[in-house]
């Protein structure tokens, strides 16, 4: 997974169809100049009230609404909630949501562009979000993702248990799709389940991906030339690598779908995905070779570096992903996949991860640096000759 780590959270069911009305609280939605030239004053008020109620309902402690707990909204809820959460808590990076453009599609449908600008001494544009507002049977507007509309005319092709969705102009590599299906079948054997049916959306690059899910602008989209993420609960991969093959993200879907009632550990989850599927364009072997030869100098404390799950090395790969991949590889080779599953579903804390690693590999906080360096050297001698 490349520099953008996207955490997608689905909302809890609320008690009413419409947004919670909290007229006493102003969430700060405002119009930019000339944003409403195509609409009437009445529609202008409707749109502002709808978005104010929507953003308010995302704040901690407010009522959650079924209107925004639809299956399509996992695609952009995370970004809006991040912005509104910061705004609600008046942090140094809170945002002001401004409506920069409204396009009237018909009397009951509007496309809205919202700009989130930091409310700081020197304002910074964080992102521009596209949303669809549709009038429901009760006459009120409701918020929808633009993703379904943006991809509705794309091609669809099924290979095994994978449904690929892609633009005509991108094309389709059937051989890579077969390789992805074969990898899915291998994961199914490991987890003792049937191959999981997934939807795989293929994009050229991160800019293409973000714009199609409704983010017209976000700085992250320019950080790398490839990447993507999985929506595990929806069994969907959004691949910004211009390829039909993305094994790392497929691993995340299998770990999520096979968790039962257990919470899975993020360190173990990324470790398994990197062990089996690499990260970025690099295999685990290449990642660990770089880690030992370039990154892990004598002055670094491996334990400190590892605890920061999303800290990246100069080659744009997460250090913890590679080291956790190393530990998962050792577990699998020496104790079998049941030990790996014990680590995967050990709980969502770093302490629970370390407890299982200590149980099998006798690695503690005190000896972490020495033991990991030793295992790293041994792995590279075996795999990077």
Predicted feature descriptions by range:
Residues 4-15:
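Sec-dependent N-terminal signal peptides
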Residues 261-385:
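Acidic/His/Gly-enriched intrinsically disordered linker/tail segments
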Residues 48-52, 177-184, 188, 247, ...:
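Extracytoplasmic/secreted envelope proteins and their assembly/folding machinery
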Residues 154-264, 352-356:
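Juxtacatalytic substrate-recognition/specificity segment
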Residues 21-50, 58, 62, 69-178, ...:
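Non-catalytic architectural context of zinc metalloproteases
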Residues 1-4, 20:
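Positively charged n-region of N-terminal signal peptides that target proteins for export
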Residues 37-49, 170-181, 237-245, 262-267, ...:
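Soluble non-cytosolic domains of exported or imported proteins
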């Amino acid at each position: 997974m490349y520099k953008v780590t996207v955490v997608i959270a689905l909302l809890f069911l609320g008690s009413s169809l419409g947004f919670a009305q909290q007229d006493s609280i102003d969430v700060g939605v405002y119009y930019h100049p000339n944003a409403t030239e195509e609409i009437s004053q009445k529609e202008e008020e409707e749109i502002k009230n709808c978005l104010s109620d929507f953003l308010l309902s995302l704040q901690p402690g407010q009522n959650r609404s079924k209107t925004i707990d639809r299956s399509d909204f996992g695609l952009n809820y995370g970004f809006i909630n991040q912005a509104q959460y910061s705004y609600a808590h008046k942090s140094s990076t809170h945002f002001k949501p401004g409506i920069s453009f409204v396009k009237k599609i018909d009397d009951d449908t509007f496309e809205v562009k919202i700009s989130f600008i930091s409310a700081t001494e020197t304002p910074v544009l964080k992102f521009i979000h596209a949303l669809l507002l549709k009038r429901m049977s009760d006459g009120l507007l409701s918020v929808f993702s633009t993703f379904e509309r943006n991809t509705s005319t794309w091609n669809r092709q099924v290979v095994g248990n994978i449904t690929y969705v892609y633009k005509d102009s991108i094309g389709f590599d059937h051989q890579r799709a077969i390789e992805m299906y074969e990898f899915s079948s291998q994961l199914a054997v490991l987890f003792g389940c049937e191959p999981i049916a997934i939807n795989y959306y293929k994009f050229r690059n991160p800019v293409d991906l973000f714009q199609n899910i409704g983010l017209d602008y976000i700085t992250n989209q320019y950080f790398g030339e490839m990447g993507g993420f999985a929506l595990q609960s929806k069994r969907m991969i959004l691949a910004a690598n211009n390829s039909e093959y993305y094994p790392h993200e497929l691993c995340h879907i299998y770990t999520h779908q096979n968790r039962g009632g257990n919470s899975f550990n993020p360190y173990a989850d990324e470790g398994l995905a990197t062990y089996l599927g690499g990260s970025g364009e690099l295999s685990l072997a290449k990642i660990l070779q770089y880690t030992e030869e370039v990154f892990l100098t004598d002055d670094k404390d491996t334990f400190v570096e590892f605890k920061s799950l999303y800290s990246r090395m100069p080659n744009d790969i997460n250090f913890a992903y590679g080291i956790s991949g190393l530990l998962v590889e050792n577990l699998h080779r020496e104790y079998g996949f049941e030990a790996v599953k014990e680590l995967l579903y050990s709980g969502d804390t770093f302490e629970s991860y370390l407890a299982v690693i200590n149980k099998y590999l006798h690695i503690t906080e005190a000896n972490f640096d020495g033991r990991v360096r030793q295992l790293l050297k041994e792995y590279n001698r075996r795999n990077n000759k």
